[in-house]
A protein has these predicted regions:
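Substrate-binding pocket helix/loop in short-chain dehydrogenase/reductase
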Residues: 89-91, 95-100, 195
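Conserved glycine-rich Rossmann-like NAD(P)H-binding loop of the short-chain dehydrogenase/reductase
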Residues: 21-36
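Short C-terminal tail/terminal secondary-structure segment
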Residues: 88, 137, 214-215, 226-239
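Residue(s) in the substrate-gating loop at a strand-loop-helix junction
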Residues: 132
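A glycine/serine/threonine-rich, flexible loop-to-helix segment
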Residues: 141-142, 165, 176-200, 209
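Active-site helix of classical SDR
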Residues: 114, 148, 156
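Alpha-helical segment proximal to the catalytic Tyr-Lys
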Residues: 119, 161-165, 223
Length: 239
């Protein structure tokens, strides 16, 4: 499960641990966050391996899969949760470096890790990709981020058809606004108090409100779902 060191990923990791799942969590460089997630997960009796590295690099993705197989002997579920976003008011302000990094983390990393995992997935396995409500409504200040999240929807649907006859499910989650460490660090301070106000509920959500969706899509309860995008956005977009 990528990006399980904090935010939505940590909430999902804890939910999986409560269901008895062991986890491998690749993360970038938030070492203390990753250690805290590991501590919480292991409190529930699950095993947790944390691996620091850059998912946009193929060799690290290969190492993640190798370590998972070495430790647990199999892969049942892949959760592509990691991502980055940066606010820019104008497309002219998006540097080549920002655009490239956003693409590499959000798309290339997902592709590389999925490609490495698929040969080891058995019938009944599940792949869960994180897209975003912004794919379905647009966001004028997150142009490169929204581009990647739209690509993830296409990737999910195409891969779902590709793997269906192997009985490997591929679905996506499209969250609305959730209060995670990513959000205040991304937006200008004056906008932070209004975040989440576009939802029908008039508020942002907490990560624990999304965690059960990750568990559902990993479980046999979703055995007839593939290629789906599950919207958990408080009514911000109704599809």
């Amino acid at each position: 499960m990528t990006g399980g060191d904090s935010g939505l990923g940590r909430a999902a990791a804890v939910a999986y641990a409560k269901e008895g799942a062991n986890l491998v969590i690749p993360y970038y460089n938030e070492h203390e966050d990753a250690k805290e997630t590991k501590r919480i997960v292991e409190k529930y009796g699950a095993k947790c391996v944390i691996l620091s590295g850059d998912l946009s690099q193929k060799e690290f993705c290969k190492a993640v899969v190798s370590k998972t197989l070495e430790t647990f002997g199999k892969i049942d579920v892949l959760v592509n949760n990691a991502g980055v976003q940066y606010q820019q008011d104008k497309i002219e302000d998006i540097s080549d470096e920002q655009f490239d990094w956003t693409m590499r983390v959000n798309i290339y990393g997902m592709f590389y890790l999925t490609r490495e995992c698929v040969p080891y997935l058995k019938s009944g396995s599940s792949i869960i990709n994180l897209t975003s409500v912004t794919t379905f409504k647009g966001d004028p200040q997150l142009i490169d981020y929204v581009t990647t999240k739209g690509a993830i929807v296409g990737f999910t649907r195409a891969l779902a058809r590709n793997l269906a006859l192997k009985n490997i499910r591929v679905n996506a989650i499209a969250p609305g606004f959730f209060w995670t460490p990513l959000q205040p660090n991304c937006w200008v301070a004056k906008k932070v108090p209004t975040l989440g106000a576009d939802a029908a509920f008039g508020r942002g959500a907490m990560p624990y409100e999304l965690a059960p969706t990750y568990v559902f899509l990993a479980s046999d309860d979703s055995s007839y779902m593939t290629g789906a995008v599950v919207h958990v956005n408080g009514g911000e977009v109704m599809a």
